């Protein structure tokens, strides 16, 4: 069984982890957190979580995931807290930054199995969603996407503990919002599971159209496929392609850089390589020829720009994500013809966003 820490005493945790100790320094707005700083709040959340009936019936493995997520849920209030001119205290963006912190912690410093790590990351990223879902422009789409990243049943459980682990005047209203979130999940068949679609094409149609009906099934199907590789330099994308797709057309940004003598740190040169690669892709797309786009594609923004291009030509897009343990990453990078400087590799690692199920028609993870 994976455990984040066998010892869960707060004093022990503060001594072991600086990022826990510094929670004592982070103040919160007393209107919403009259209990005090982030350290006090986090301890109250952990205590509330333990006594929740829904938590107590979980397996020990699942309890550990939720415990770790609760421990980490406000970790980046440290870097995002602002004392506003009107006297309020805000921490906008702490969930997104907290998710990045959790991924780095559980990939580099305290390695966790991929599925466990990403579930914790998802819980940290979306821990406020049950409260704020209905204030989003498209609550249903936001929910469907979240269900494809994280267990919504656990998310509601974490949100409930988060709300019970504070002192505030609007607690009853916030708990009612969580009840509404649970009901909305159940109504839309994504309570504790990813929302299913009849096909990858139906899923992509819904994701790419603002007014799409959730259960709409498009008549036409894609005629060809683009495989979008994703993974850090040195993760083994080239090896994976040679093994599984030896006969496919490949657009490789690394190979183009090597051929032209362009450094991975040359922004102008890399911009030219990307434009050339896109022009070559358009040639294949117009001919409806299947091919592989081989590059790092380590952020959602990078991937979505390419996926928008590919789907404009009605291609089916499959994301293939490749990962190796961090301890192997630098060694494998050094053995490549197109090796990336260590500082660049670490920067990419710290910005890494794992592909989500909703991003493409199909997604596969290959984690060693």
Annotate each language-model stretch with its function.
Residues 227, 247, 326-368:
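Conserved GTP-binding G-domain of TRAFAC-class P-loop NTPases and closely related GTPase folds
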Residues 313-332:
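Conserved phosphate-donor/acceptor-positioning beta-strand/loop module used by diverse small-molecule
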Residues 238-291, 326-330:
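Conserved substrate/cofactor phosphate-moiety recognition/catalytic segment
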Residues 51-177:
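Divalent metal-dependent catalytic cores for phosphoryl transfer on phosphate-bearing substrates
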Residues 225-245:
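Glycine-rich phosphate-binding P-loop
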Residues 186-221:
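N-terminal pre-Walker A segment at the start of P-loop NTPase domains
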Residues 30-44, 86-100, 273, 296-299:
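Active-site metal-coordination segments of metallo-dependent hydrolases
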Residues 1-83:
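Acidic/His-rich, divalent-metal-binding segments that scaffold phosphate/diphosphate chemistry
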